[in-house]
Amino acid sequence: MELGGPATAGATDTAGQLFKDELSDKCQKLFLEFLEECKGKDGSNLYVSAAEELVRPERNTLVVNFTDIEYYNQQLATTIQEEYYRVYPHLCRAVRSFARQMGNIPANKEFYVAFSDFPARQKIRELSSAKIGTLLRISGQVVRTHPVHPELVSGTFLCMDCQSVVKDVEQQFRYTQPTICKNPVCANRRRFTLDTNKSRFVDFQKVRIQETQAELPRGAIPRSVEIILRAEAVETAMAGDRCDFTGTLIVVPDISALAAGDARMETGAKVTGGEGFNSEGVQGLKALGVRDLSYRLAFLACHVGATNPRFGGKDLREEDQTAESIKNQMTVQEWEKVFEMSQDKNLYHNLCTSLFPTIHGNDEIKRGVLLMLFGGVPKTTMEGTSLRGDINVCIVGDPSTSKSQFLKHVEEFSPRAVYTSGKASSAAGLTAAVVKDEESHEFVIEAGALMLADNGVCCIDEFDKMDLKDQVAIHEAMEQQTISITKAGVKATLNARTSILAAANPVGGRYERSKSLKHNVNLSAPIMSRFDLFFILVDECNEVTDYAIARRIVDLHARNEESIERVYSIEDIQRYLLFARQFQPKITKEAEEFIVEQYRRLRQRDGSGVAKSSWRITVRQLESLIRLSESMARMHCSDEVQPKHVKEAFRLLSKSIIRVDTPDVSFDQGEDEKNVEEEVNNANLNNGEEAMETNQDEPINDKPSTNAGLKMSFAEYKQISNLLVLHMQKMEEVEEECHLTTTDLVNWYLKEMEAEIETETELILKKRLIEKVIHRLINYDHILIELNKSELKTMDDSKETSEDAAEDRILVVNPNYMLED
């Protein structure tokens, strides 16, 4: 096919039918016969009901399945494919004739045809001038959408010299006037005015798509192409959608380049030499027409569809989908597999191992990421406030602990996932940017990573390296799931219904156990509270673990595919995920009470001051507990949230919030250390013969043991404190007016530890240690409250020595303290 074919045909057609295109007329006749005769399996006409819909004023496009044309007439299908741009106007006339048979239609109404299910698909990178005018299908991700405008497709002009009317002047993607007045006497070529009442306009929208990461060659920059949508195809593709576009490649004038060329011509004409001659001179044939021949490729689409609409694309989380409709889209074998998975008693574990087969261990993170993919149930309150259902997860860990591997796995698995790096991304790149269009000079919105991941997952690596101003930009997106923009005269609120999976490194590169999580990560408190789950990965030296990891990595390098063991394939998991996400589980009465009880426990732990939380427990953690419980119910295809689902959600949340490594408890040493040393030395001297046999090295060796006695692990400290509190509570239950003093508590503890004490030195150290523990419980943790006996007596008996007052301390347990399990 010659490139000038379509343009020539159009031009001669408008110039008074001087040339008759027999090929197009034949295609029009065959296509009309196809519409009238094409029948389905039940014997009824496939396109009669669709044509009857065209009677409605808002409908003007008939969608035709291309495989039906191939089945009906292969030669017709080949001609449409190879000469699409040439025969398209005639196909539209055939649709108009077919629609008029169905009902009364206005004479001036235009109709269009769109082709779906075109078999072959081209990559954006493979588009070339050889494919201009042929029927193609391309796919990509929408990154920019322009507002809808009216486009002049056929103009009626009035000659300003002789008042003659020139009808149906086809517009070649720019404002095109008649070449000459049709009146033989009039020689006007330039002075025409457009009659808008008799001209034809159509809805027109431009969108820009770019290559997806899956199609992109390694290390290459994504290519983009502009898509032109008309009629009913407008507003069908939103920013972030992955769509298939069926249409043809066309050549359009580059308006911006033409405008720049005109400007250069105007300025260049004014520059003259010293004697009045043009200093530019004659450029020769090399530059001839360069300014005027500025064209670029664009794609004129007639049909827009979702990429893989069954198990991915933009239909992943459509609200109108139900479990029944998803089931109807599956084959019998696919449905049997989904049903088999739903009955699997070990489904939780099998999904985790199948989803991350190359990552050894880290089972808790696998469970958390899996629940993130299933997600909770989004809700809308009576006031119209939206409550998010998406789960946000953050992984904090030392280098080389497979953080980025989790993000890469999710990006490859999820049909709508965006991977980005925090340091290399700006606030506009993460949310949305307002840019100026090159042609219309209007401001349009270009989607950022969070908008592109709408109804999907946004994986952000190096999350802690983001600048503070960029972190603030995603506050709204993480909680309200919207992005508000007010700049350059554009005010908009855009959807960002995405789950965020972030990976961050600790401050200094290594996670310090002596500090809490909030001191280990360079993140603000508002950002941390918006994450539902935090996971900590510490690179520990463990012989068994190191051997298992090394064996796994060597296995992957040596045998590659053979070493990967999956219970379910990726396609099975995607299918099951799509089916399970259609469930909207409700919280039962038992689960509701259990959730309230677990949240009370979390708040109580946070308020007790003993357990070191990673951050403050707020209502957001309660909402996280609800979302995780709903996700567990969805995973098991349950319509109700049961207490067992809440239990697993609480376990994951507890690991994330409470289980923060705590440092050893160090007691103040100072002068107390000297007193301990004196008592130890006196005890050794009183032992007689043992003191005589002691050499000079032994006192030096005793010092470390003394120092070690004033320091203990947090677990030991918690064990002793729980033991003391339990004893006091039991004594209070037995005797209502129980007055336990510090001395009573010390003596009771030493009696309990009697079997472990062998020497007098150990007795003195144990006594000093328990006194320090009681002192800390009173003054720092406020678990115990001290009362002096003098406060219980009359004021006259209050004159006592400080030593007597110390001995007379009465201890009671703080009524607000709850003993941990």
Swiss-Prot record:
The keyword DNA-binding applies. It comes from the Eukaryota. PANTHER family: DNA REPLICATION LICENSING FACTOR MCM FAMILY MEMBER (PTHR11630), DNA REPLICATION LICENSING FACTOR MCM6 (PTHR11630:SF93). A motif (Arginine finger) lies at residues 529-532. InterPro entries: MCM, MCM6, Mcm6_C, MCM_CS, MCM_dom, MCM_lid, MCM_N, MCM_OB. Keywords: ATP-binding, Cell cycle, Chromosome, DNA replication, DNA-binding, Helicase, Hydrolase, Metal-binding, Nucleotide-binding, Nucleus, Zinc, Zinc-finger. A zinc finger (C4-type) spans 159-186. Residues 347-554 form the MCM domain. It catalyses: ATP + H2O = ADP + phosphate + H(+). It is found in: Nucleus; Chromosome. ATP binds at G397, D398, P399, S400, T401, S402, K403, S404. GO terms for molecular function: ATP binding; ATP hydrolysis activity; DNA binding; DNA helicase activity; zinc ion binding. Acts as a component of the mcm2-7 complex (mcm complex) which is the putative replicative helicase essential for 'once per cell cycle' DNA replication initiation and elongation in eukaryotic cells. The active ATPase sites in the mcm2-7 ring are formed through the interaction surfaces of two neighboring subunits such that a critical structure of a conserved arginine finger motif is provided in trans relative to the ATP-binding site of the Walker A box of the adjacent subunit. The six ATPase active sites, however, are likely to contribute differentially to the complex helicase activity. Component of the mcm2-7 complex (RLF-M). The complex forms a toroidal hexameric ring with the proposed subunit order mcm2-mcm6-mcm4-mcm7-mcm3-mcm5. The heterodimer of mmcm3/mcm5 interacts with mcm4, mmcm6, mcm7 and weakly with mcm2. Component of the CMG helicase complex, composed of the mcm2-7 complex, the GINS complex and cdc45. GO terms for biological process: cell cycle DNA replication; DNA replication initiation; regulation of DNA-templated DNA replication initiation. This is Maternal DNA replication licensing factor mcm6. One of its GO terms (cellular component) is MCM complex. The keyword rRNA-binding does not apply. Its EC number is 3.6.4.12. Belongs to the MCM family. Pfam families: MCM, MCM6_C, MCM_lid, MCM_N, MCM_OB.
